[in-house]
Each structure stands twice: as structure tokens, then as C-alpha cells.
């Protein structure tokens, strides 16, 4: 996939560090995400990817470093304040309201974002995630892939400028993974995507740029082609897959 015309710097992470006791989860992470791109973050299990995403979304506060979003320092802002500025996150584990149907879940997310056009926006989101025909279905009637798609729908309900997708293809079979790939490809038309994903083949198909996180540090950040051929990345990660 070719890289789109360079957009403005949207997310700028500088020297972000986080420890849990004696365990270093983030060791001076530097990361830049530009508007309009799909930027993928890959790395082995335990590399610190989910910890980094939690810091970006505000669920964890870094020990040191700086996070800037759209030119403003958001390092100490709450998740709610970050969401109001246009930064949204989906989760590895679905956080769906099982007492509501599919449309009801999306409506709650739309209303939480302060939209006054709930019905219209719910319809738009369901179309985007491919669940229009399941709008009245209960959550337990959905497949694993459909539940993950709905989780993405909740994240984009507020029309964020940047959406953090934390391993959206985890636990999926081939067909469901390809449907999620198609969904992510659609998202790029109107939002920037930071994709954290273990499926490197999907990453190389989808991403404009790829960053590789190993032992809490970004060791490479470039085009998919450059990352795939990087000797250091092959030795530290890709050669062990």
C-alpha cells in the first residue's frame, strides 16, 4: 500500500517511560503518527504494546515523557478529556452492554459523545462496520468477529481524529480477519488509525508506516517494505515469528 500525501503530525510521543516495580514496560518510546495514515505498531508478546496504548489513551500515566496530540500536550489529561479532543480507543476484550442490542450499544456511544443526531449517526456507524443487518441482534448472537467489529464501532461513534485499535483481529479465523482488514481500510477514509496488531501479514497489507516495539523501545519506524527488510527487526522479531 502506498503512503498517502504527508499529513500534519497528529500524535507525537517523546521519551515515554513507564515502570512497574522493577519491570520496564516503556523505555523512552518515541513515536510519530501523521494525519490520514494507518500506522501499525508491532512487536513480540511482552514488548509493551498494550501498556503504551493505555498511556496514549490516558488509562495509565507515564513516569516521564510527553504525549502531544494535534499540537497540544495531553500527557496529564484524563481519558475523557482526550476523547473530547478526538482520540478514541477500542479494546482487546470487548466491553459491550449485553442487555442492549447492537444498535442500542452504538446509540449509547453516540450519546456519550454528545451527538444530537443519534439515529443518523447510529445508522452511519452500523453501515461502516458492516452490521446494519444485525442492528436488532443481541450481543450473544454475534460471532466473535462481529463483536470485535462492534467494539470498533463504539470507538468511532464520536468521529475521532485518531482511533487506537488494540489487536482487533485477536482470536479470529481467516474470514473474520479479512473482514476486519476491510473495515480498517474503510476507516482510513475519514480517520487516522494507530493499529496494534500481532498479525504481521495483515499489518504489511494495511499499513502506510510500521513501528516495531521490542523490550519497551521502538527499534524501527518506516514503510512496511523497509521494516520487512530491516536486519535489526528480522533479528529481534520477524525472524522469530
For the regions a protein language model found, what residue spans apply to each?
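Glycine-rich phosphate-binding loops of nucleotide-dependent enzymes
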Residues: 2-241
